[in-house]
Amino acid sequence: MSIVSRTFPAKVTKLIIFVTSQEFNKKGMRVIGIGETVLDILFKDDQPQKAVPGGSTFNSIISLGRAGVPCAMVTEAGGDHIGDITCRYLEENGVSAEFVCRHEGVKSHVSLAFLDEHNDAQYIFYKDHASVSMDGKLPRITSEDAVLFGSFFAINPAIRPVVGGLLHAAREAGAWIYYDVNFRKNHIADLPRVLPLAEENMGLADVVRGSTEDFGYLYGLQDGEAIYGRVGRFCRTLILTDGARAVRVFTPEGCETYPVPAIETVSTVGAGDNFNAGYIYATLRGFPDQTSRIAMASRWSQDVCRQMGNNISPELVASLQR
């Protein structure tokens, strides 16, 4: 497999003429996120710092909404105050909450994120995956749509009939599909049941994105070429991230490597989620090649790492509109 190293252009914003949010609407473009919602409570030195609605796909969709991309979120939440906060947060950031399935008498999920000395997060989740259900309104997906999905929500057997059916409908409609593996250590015991579902998801996707940590848990592999040897059976394009180390993009034509600039971090919560959002944003805006798309993805990821929050900053949003 050939390996090529790329460097980022000095000014990503000069690569193309941006599509405005009005033009997104004219073209009928929409990003549909499918994933869980949680209330993220961030801790530093064991003290709570911030509470904000989150979830992997949710974080991506909020950032895309802030950037002016028409979005909708397919998820579920309790019929409690946290669920109210979640739906309001979606709408405040320009994301449709029409497809949020609310369950009266059920508590919304909560996540505690403890930041270490490197500002990397260790998580404790308070949620019952077996009680999750999806019996609400679902979107009609068309070829004009992009679909982002991932995490355990995408392989949870309790809701697989609904989620799997929606993904197959998206594939048949000709939507562009991006799968974020985001497989956590606490689900290793579920692998015999969920690995076939994860690989089915890969087969439905145009792009698979995962970290070396994800695939270490999923396949017991750390080597990039070995990982692509598994993923490439199902999807032609794999984006492999590795924290602060270089991003690698694998295709049948070979592997390209993109160094990641070093930055001072405040929190790495949402780093991968906003990488996904930036890549999708660049793709929808017609960025011409992987170099420019990965550069924009890294720019979004780094922006969220410089703050205590899950989504891109107003400053980045303003820079996209120039």
State where each predicted segment sits:
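Conserved N-terminal subdomain of the carbohydrate kinase-like
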Residues: 41, 70-151, 321-322
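Conserved post-catalytic alpha-helical subdomain immediately downstream of the catalytic base
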Residues: 237, 259-322
